[in-house]
Curated annotation (Swiss-Prot):
Binding site for GTP: 142-148
Role played: Tubulin is the major constituent of microtubules. The gamma chain is found at microtubule organizing centers (MTOC) such as the spindle poles, suggesting that it is involved in the minus-end nucleation of microtubule assembly.
Protein's UniProt name: Tubulin gamma-2 chain
GO biological process, one term: mitotic spindle organization
The encoding gene: TUBG2
Organism: Oryza sativa subsp. japonica (Rice)
InterPro entries reported for this sequence: Gamma_tubulin, Tub_FtsZ_C, Tubulin, Tubulin/FtsZ-like_C, Tubulin/FtsZ_2-layer-sand-dom, Tubulin/FtsZ_GTPase_sf, Tubulin_C, Tubulin_CS
Cellular location(s): Cytoplasm, Cytoskeleton, Microtubule organizing center
Family: Belongs to the tubulin family.
Length: 469
């Protein structure tokens, strides 16, 4: 029985990456822009109903909600070639359409005011599922709607659907460019608190790294949002292939995540992908082997999260877990030999308190998407160096907070009125604790460190409790 997943796209960024994701899924399953199955899509074996359901006229509709506080991006989707794909009852745009003004507090407050309308949509989708497994939230952490309203929805989902998994694809801002959102550090910190406490898994999509990959690997001088969004949709679709083309393992979300997240708080994943699309067009077609793909996935230049670690810290960073999803014509003996070669060459530095092995899931490719390579791979990895990304967010927050800069923007809203800034302080403490825990993971004594935290034992079965019988 398929375990359905409902996708919730929040804000400008969330809806843009969500749209690219659905385009990719339609291509891979032979579904036309109007939701009707293409005449050539005659091969079975795929599970469309994890992400789609069929209307009475047999056309496929995404299990998706499109939510925004200003209409521009959603209007663009409704005027695009894909306008008939979505269920229009699942589109929410705020009546005033003024957006959140890149202010987390505004997005959160407006989320409180409209949550009943949005939860009605979510409940309706959930009731239409035979065996709902969970939710996927697409958003950014730096603006107003995706961060603030996304945070409120995360808390509400956690409360209302406590037994269901919540996974997010969270876009982190580009740290190499001057942001036009001056309060970005405040928004990011407040959102990170909710991602730590209210999500079961966060796939970190770091715009800094995505831009670097687009420039260095894809040879694009000035990557556009559309080009970096296509990288994101590649990662999102590849990370769901084992759910949509089921094999013996990792064919549901809880199985996928349980292998990657051994400890509840450390649930932030980084990704790597090879070979990349435009790269194949620029260079000559190369021979792709399982070993070649698996080795490339471990190279820093292919990893889609920037590490701000200094040299010494970088050498101490360790993998907590790795899952490689390999697509294409693959012989399992090649996988075994590749793993052996990687072990012999000591290419991976694992933690000392857990299973030190790369897990591999084999998945077939879509028969409807032609590629020039035989094998491609996605790496989902839990790696301690991600703490440096959080430390960077903390450092930027401290700079603004010391100057008491732009706090009046937040004091206008109920959570911060009467100059109550305790929400900032609490968020900072939670992220500092997260950084400390990722650092502790590098030590062989981490298990003891976990026991010192009184609440940890109670949370340890968090993922297990979401195994719905």
């Amino acid at each position: 029985m398929p375990r359905e997943i409902i996708t919730i796209q929040v804000g400008q960024c969330g809806n843009q990456i969500g749209m690219e994701f659905w385009k990719q899924l339609c291509l891979e399953h032979g579904i036309g822009k109007d939701g009707l199955l293409e005449d050539f899509a005659t091969q079975g074996g795929d599970r469309k109903d994890v992400f789609f359901y069929q209307a009475d006229d047999q056309h496929y509709i995404p299990r998706a909600l499109l939510v925004d506080l200003e209409p521009r991006v959603i209007n663009g989707i409704q005027n695009s070639e894909y306008r008939n794909l979505y269920n229009h009852e699942n589109i929410f745009v705020a009546e005033h359409g003024g957006g959140a003004g890149n202010n987390w507090a505004s997005g959160y407050h407006q989320g409180e005011q409209v949550v009943d309308d949005i939860m009605d949509m979510i409940d309706r989708e959930a009731d239409g599922s035979d065996s709902l497994e969970g939710f996927v939230l697409c958003h950014s952490i730096a603006g107003g709607t995706g961060s603030g309203m996304g945070s409120y929805l995360l808390e509400t989902l956690n409360d209302r659907y406590s037994k269901k998994l919540v996974q997010t694809y969270s876009v982190f801002p580009n740290q190499m460019e001057t942001s036009d959102v001056v309060v970005q550090p405040y928004n990011s910190l407040l959102t990170l608190k909710r991602l730590t406490l209210n999500a079961d898994c966060v796939v970190v999509l770091d715009n800094t790294a995505l831009n670097r990959i687009a420039v260095e690997r894809l040879h694009l001088a000035n990557p556009t949002f559309a080009q970096t969004n296509s990288l994101v949709s590649t990662v999102m679709s590849a990370s769901t292939t084992t759910l949509r083309y089921p094999g013996y393992m990792n064919n549901d979300l809880v199985g996928l995540l349980a292998s990657l997240i051994p400890t509840p708080r450390c649930h932030f994943l980084m990704t790597g992908y090879t070979p990349l699309t435009v790269e194949r067009q620029v260079n000559m077609i190369r021979k792709t082997t399982v070993l070649d793909v698996m080795r490339r996935l471990l190279q820093t230049k292919n990893i889609m999260v920037s590490s701000y670690a200094r040299n010494k810290e970088a050498s101490q960073a360790k993998y907590i877990s790795i899952l490689n999803i390999i697509q294409g014509e693959v012989d399992p003996t090649q996988v075994h030999e590749s793993l052996q070669r990687i072990r012999e060459r000591k290419l991976v530095n694992f933690i000392e308190w857990g299973p030190a092995s790369i897990q591999v899931a084999l998945s077939r490719k879509s028969p409807y998407v032609q590629t020039t390579h035989r094998v491609s791979g996605l790496m989902l990895a839990n790696h301690t160096s991600i703490r440096h990304l959080f430390s960077k967010c903390l450092g930027q927050y401290e700079k603004l907070r010391k100057k008491q800069a732009f706090l009046d923007n937040y004091r206008k809203f109920p959570m911060f009125e009467d100059n109550d800034l305790s929400e900032f302080d609490e968020s900072r403490e939670i992220i500092e604790s997260l950084v400390d825990e990722y650092k502790a993971c590098e030590s062989p004594d981490y298990i003891k460190w976990g026991m010192e935290d009184a609440g940890e034992a109670n949370v340890a079965a968090a993922l297990d409790s979401k195994l719905v019988v």
